[in-house]
Amino acid sequence: MAVSKLWSVTSRLGQVIDYAANPEKTAADIYTEEQYQALRDVLSHAKDEEKTECEFFVEGINCNPATARDQFVSVKKAYGKDDGIQAYHGYLSFKEQDISPELAQKIGMEFANEVWGKRFQVVVTTHLNTKHLHCHYVINSVSFVDGKRLWGDEKAWFKFRLVADRLCEKYGLYYNPNPNRSKQSSYYYKQEQA
């Protein structure tokens, strides 16, 4: 089951992006030392050695993760909205089970594309440093398409949950199709509106 959360970032945009893309959290050793040597021998002319040693799970949607901060700021300045909320930071965490970093990142990218990809710049990373693999999202608070701000509310959270549940089902991961999280009628009303 995937769990999601989203919160606003009002300062230090660069630090949030750096945290999400932290190499110590997003790198996976994919080869043994023996395999490294074989790769070095075979691919020494074609590949940079550092790039064959590990894989990083850091991608961008409508932006380059390496320059995302500058790209986010450029969009804000272009629309005169460089104050207030700078970005949103969120995560999608997976139940401890057999999920590979590759699949977590794939689901994370699909999730971000569906929820924000048509209008917003998003940095998507998968952190591998805990028992529960989890994707981090840093979303520009201003749309590059129309300059409108991203607003997070409880209704949006239900949409996130529905998208996450559908993707978990699609990839054969556990999800709870009928969570009884609250007995309040407003909870169900907001769910229906999502």
Q: Where in this protein do the model-derived segments appear?
A:
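N-terminal nicking endonuclease/strand-transfer module with a His-rich metal-binding environment
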Residues: 1-194
